[in-house]
Amino acid sequence: PGAARRVVSVCGGSAARATHPTAPNLAEDVVAFQGEPGAFSELALKRYFQNETMQSVPCESFRCVFESVLAGQTRFGIIPIENSLAGSIHENYDLLLQYPDINIIGEKKIRIIHNLIGFSDVAISDLKAVYSHPQGLAQCAKFLDGFPDIQRVPFYDTAGSVAHIAKEKKTD
C-alpha cells in the first residue's frame, strides 16, 4: 500500500557517557528501539550495526528509548526522524530538545514497505478497521482513502498491531 524512506537516527549519550568504563549499568552492546520485535526501527538497527553484535531491546515509546540511554540500560537508541511520505517525526525532534545529553551519532536510511495484514479468509471489503502506528497510517493514507468505511485505529507500533490482531483474532 505505501512505500517510504525514513531517516532513522542512532542516538547515544554524550561521547563521555557512552564510552566511560565506570558508568553505572552501562550496557555496551545493547540498543533500544521503539516497538515490538520486527518493527521498522529494529530493521534499521540491524542494518546500522550489521558488522557488530548488538542486542536489541524493544521499548513502548520513543521517550522510553531516550530514558534507557540516559539511565545506562542501553548504550544506544534508534529512533525515526523523518520519512518521505508523512514528513518529520515531530515527537522525536521535541525529545532531542528535551534530552540535551542525547546526541545523534549516525543515521540509516531504510525503505519502508507497508503491508495490509489480516487473516487469509477475510476479504478487504469486510474490514471495518486498520490498526497501525500513526506514522504508518499517515504513510498509507492515499491507499486507505480508497476505503472510506475502514476506520483507522492508531496503535503504538506497526509490528505490535499485527501481534494484537493475531492475539485478539480480529477478523474485521
Could you say what each language-model-derived stretch is?
Residues P1-D172:
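Domain-level signature for soluble enzymes in the chorismate/prephenate branch of the shikimate pathway
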